[in-house]
Amino acid sequence: MRNFTFKGLFLEVVFIVLGSLSIQAADGDLITKQITIKLEEAGTLPSKIGDTKKYKITNLKIMGEINGTDLCFIREMAGSDREGWRTEGKLATLDLSGAKIVRGGGIYYNSVNCYTSDDVIGNYAFSGCCSLTSLILPSNVTSIGYSAFYGCIRLTSLTLPSSVTSIGSSAFEGCRSLTS
């Protein structure tokens, strides 16, 4: 039988507590460096990033074709799911300059059954994505839909390509931080 001293027992408890704290901190760490994802096929972003990193990435660049499935996943990463409910997403900076929006995939916003169309930022595409602070749109986007960025309260910078010829009503409603 071992003899325990108060000092020895105290040190064991301290090591156990500190060990569990560092494990918890590692699980909650954010990924702040830019992550670049090259999609060979639309609809594959969820499998490229996975659920373990989905809510930890804060800076993302996507190259390749993206569809409704990808946009739904991006929305979740940026703070809003397809129902418009808040998520744990922390995505602040999104660079889509090397991406192309294409038709297909699943619904990205359920309330009004929104699907993607070629070269269009659709209705409600980023609505409620309250983690987004900076967004660069694809260079070939021609249209921005109704309420596309509605309620993006932290969005400060949005890069629109010169190819945009129409912007829907209320597209930027509630974007109170937008400065450029």
Over which residues does each language-model region extend?
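Flexible, charged surface loops at secondary-structure boundaries
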Residues: 49-57, 87-88
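Short, T/G/N/S-enriched strand-turn elements that build extracellular solenoid repeat scaffolds
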Residues: 43-53, 69-79
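Extracellular beta-strand-rich solenoid/capping regions of secreted or surface-exposed proteins
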Residues: 71-86, 106-128
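Bacterial N-terminal signal peptides that target proteins for export
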Residues: 1-11
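Bacterial N-terminal signal peptides
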Residues: 9-20
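Structural signature of tandem-repeat unit edges
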Residues: 32-40, 58-66, 89-119, 130-143, ...
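Boundary at the C-terminal end of the N-terminal hydrophobic targeting segment
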Residues: 23-28
